Structures are given as structure tokens and as C-alpha cells.
Amino acid sequence: SEMCIRDRFHTVLQPISTELNQWMNADFEYNIKYPEQRIHKSASGLMVRSKSEALIATLLSHNRIPFRYECALCLGETTLHPDFTLRHPKTGAFYYWEHFGLMDFPSYRKNVFSKLQLYTAHNIIPSIQLITTYETSEHPFDSAYAEQLIHYYFGD
């Protein structure tokens, strides 16, 4: 009977893992603005815009969380490029991760809150499908906290 359970379990998981592999490896519309700012490399070789994003990408890869960097997301009339579009490895559900790394600057903060309003207007809710991390000069990015977030949202 243990064999039957394992076989049924495998049958349920196989299609989602196949879909997620295809999703991760497929071409996608990404943010083409300011490619010269992609100067930080994650452990897997992905070029990103900040050291904190490189750490997040490395943690996601290490924890086998399927993701895309700066993939286009159409919300009504507006196209955003969330830092990370993620898929839950077991359910395939979509999540988004925005790292707001320049919170010292008032104009940046204003843009952050506009972006959060746009997400919530389209039913993408912070701490439900939207993971957010923040950084200031006095409170730098905490990779241990990011690791905790990954385990909270996606399990072990």
C-alpha cells in the first residue's frame, strides 16, 4: 500500500514539476531598460541590478524555487517588471518578490507605495502573493531573513 501512495503522489507531482521546468526555461518578456545596471552576478550566473537581488536569486536557486527575474506583468493598463516572479514548487501558484533597496530616498519611497497600490488594486496582496523586502543605509539587506521568508512561503 505504501507503493500505491508513492505512485499516486508521484503522478500528482510530475506534471507540475514538468510545467515548472518548462516555465523556467521558456523565453519571456523581461525588462529591457538600463541593461548596463545589471552588474551583480548571482551564484547561478544571473546578472541582476543589486547585491541584494543577487543574494535573493542565489537563495531561490539554492532552495529550488522556480523564478524569473524582471518578467513582465500586465496589471490593467500598466506593465510592471517585478524583481522576481516565482512559482510554488508544489502547487505552481504564482508569487512576486519586490526588493525595495533605496528606501532612504523620498522619491523612491513614493514610487514604492504607488507600486504597492497597483499590486493591491489587482488583488496581489503584500504578505499573501507579494513578498516584499526593504533596505536603507542603516538597515541593510538581511539574507537570513530572506531565507526565513523562502521557508515560510515555500516550505523546506
Where are these regions (language model features)?
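Acidic-and-aromatic substrate-binding clefts and catalytic sites of carbohydrate-active enzymes
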Residues: 73-79, 105-106, 136-141
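Short, small-residue-biased leader/transition segments that mark boundaries at the very start
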Residues: 3-5
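A short, surface-exposed helix-loop junction/capping segment
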Residues: 30-44
